């Protein structure tokens, strides 16, 4: 059960990464201060550690090769969850989408 829980944690983290990146993008485009948005979300039911620490989490200042490697690790970490879902006949399209979007989310592509 521990390994299954780890797979599910990776799904939650990666989907939260997508939500954080898209929220940041929309904040920038609409003029909403992202830091203020994070503070508001922190006290709501949509709070997430990934969103709370997004600027540090995505590490935009690191070399692209390092960010690319991190994105690859996150994408690979979703493969076992996708395989398990296929084996038990469960559709998890959000996870499949997250796997494809991770490089964009981490400012690589």
Give residue spans per PLM region.
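Helical "substrate-binding/catalytic lid" subdomain
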Residues: 2-94, 99-109
């Amino acid at each position: 059960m521990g390994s299954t829980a780890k797979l599910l944690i990776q799904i939650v983290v990666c989907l939260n990464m997508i939500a954080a990146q898209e929220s940041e993008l929309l904040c920038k485009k609409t003029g909403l201060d992202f830091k203020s948005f994070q503070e508001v979300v922190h006290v709501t039911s949509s709070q997430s550690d990934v969103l709370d620490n997004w600027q540090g989490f995505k590490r935009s200042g690191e070399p692209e090769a390092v960010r690319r490697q991190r994105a690859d690790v996150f994408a690979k970490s979703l493969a076992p969850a996708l395989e398990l879902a296929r084996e038990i006949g469960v559709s998890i399209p959000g996870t499949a989408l997250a796997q494809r979007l991770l490089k964009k989310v981490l400012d690589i592509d």
